[in-house]
């Protein structure tokens, strides 16, 4: 059994001036976990990000440099800069590009999970990466189309590996990973029976090239994501209520596609927002990259307040 909790505070602010628009954000969180498998764990996190958007040639060109600084009590301080560039070719047609560094700390599952086939590794190091992306966006009223291609180079990849077929799978930082991807997104708003609807359709294709490893058996190599298709539908039933569903179809290297359905209900009351979610409504049995089974049907209730 797992009991997890997260307590946090997030503050975001934007400032506009004759020099452009600045953004600042702070996120502080405490994460706690009690598990009969992972043990009792705690993690403190602090995130600070700063960015500034410059406009040139009558807002036809935008350049947005930024940096994020992250602290985890068990992994220390790290920073990862990035930059976005956009160019409006003609009205409603824009090309963009971005590049930046990414950073992912090991999860409690990566560090401490144990079962009859798998063990974690408390000595794992964070994954790091560098991503480059170029894309184009077309807007016509409420109809938006976005197409993009990206390349990601990751190091210290966390993978589950073993030397012999009879060994247990163990988490290790073992390889470099180069990923090429294509993304497409179509979304629009429309009305049916005086109710506001919003639909989003997205598709992602990924091609991974795993660096040479001295270990012959790799979970990532046999279970990396290849195709990911998502449909999102939201309906506003008035000023206060919104319902939504998300249907996800995924196919991995091992060739076992699966579908996951999530439902949500939002109720807005003044500055308060209450959200109820049912994830994996159909209790689909599936695993993510690390082959650890994901939860069956489960619920989440969140409360938010706007200052």
Q: For each of these PLM feature ranges, what is it?
A:
Residues 20-26, 61-65, 95-97, 145-147, ...:
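Transmembrane beta-strands of outer-membrane beta-barrel proteins
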Residues 19-23, 56-60, 151-153, 173-251, ...:
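Gram-negative outer-membrane beta-barrel transporters
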Residues 9-15, 48-54, 83-87, 134-138, ...:
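Residues on the lipid-exposed face of transmembrane beta-strands in outer-membrane beta-barrel proteins
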Residues 1-78, 82, 86-88, 146, ...:
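Face-selective signature of the C-terminal outer-membrane beta-barrel domain
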Residues 17-19, 28-34, 67-73, 99-105, ...:
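Transmembrane beta-strands of outer-membrane beta-barrel pores
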Residues 97, 217-307:
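Conserved C-terminal beta-signal and adjacent last beta-strands/turns
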Residues 2, 101-155, 162-191, 222-227, ...:
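Outer-membrane beta-barrel signature, preferentially recognizing the C-terminal barrel domain
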């Amino acid at each position: 059994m797992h009991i997890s909790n997260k307590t946090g505070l997030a503050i975001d602010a934007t400032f506009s001036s004759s020099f452009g628009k600045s953004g600042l954000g702070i996120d502080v969180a405490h994460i706690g976990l009690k598990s009969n498998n992972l043990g009792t764990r705690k993690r403190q996190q602090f995130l600070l990000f700063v960015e500034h958007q410059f406009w040139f040639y009558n807002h036809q060109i935008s350049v947005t440099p930024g940096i994020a600084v992250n602290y985890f009590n068990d992994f220390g301080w790290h920073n990862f800069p990035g930059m976005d560039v956009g160019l409006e070719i003609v009205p409603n047609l824009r090309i963009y590009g971005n590049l930046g560094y990414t950073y992912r700390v090991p999860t409690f599952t990566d560090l401490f999970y144990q079962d009859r086939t798998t063990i974690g590794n408390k000595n794992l190091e964070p994954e790091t990466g560098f991503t480059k992306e170029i894309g184009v966006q077309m807007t016509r009223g409420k109809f938006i189309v976005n197409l993009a291609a990206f390349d990601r180079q990751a190091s210290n990849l966390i993978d589950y590996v073993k030397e012999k077929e009879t060994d247990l799978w163990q988490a290790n930082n073992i390889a470099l990973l180069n990923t090429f991807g294509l993304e497409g997104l179509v979304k629009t708003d429309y009305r049916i029976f005086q109710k506001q609807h919003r639909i989003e359709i997205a598709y992602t294709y990924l091609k991974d090239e795993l660096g040479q490893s001295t270990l012959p058996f790799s979970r990532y190599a046999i279970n990396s994501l290849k195709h990911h298709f998502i449909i999102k539908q939201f309906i506003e039933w008035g000023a206060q209520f919104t319902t939504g569903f998300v249907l996800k179809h995924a196919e991995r290297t091992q060739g076992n596609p699966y579908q996951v359905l999530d439902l949500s209900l939002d109720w807005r009351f003044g500055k308060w927002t209450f959200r109820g979610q049912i994830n994996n409504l159909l209790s689909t049995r599936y695993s993510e990259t690390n082959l650890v089974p994901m939860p069956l049907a489960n619920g989440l209730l969140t409360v938010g307040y706007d200052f």
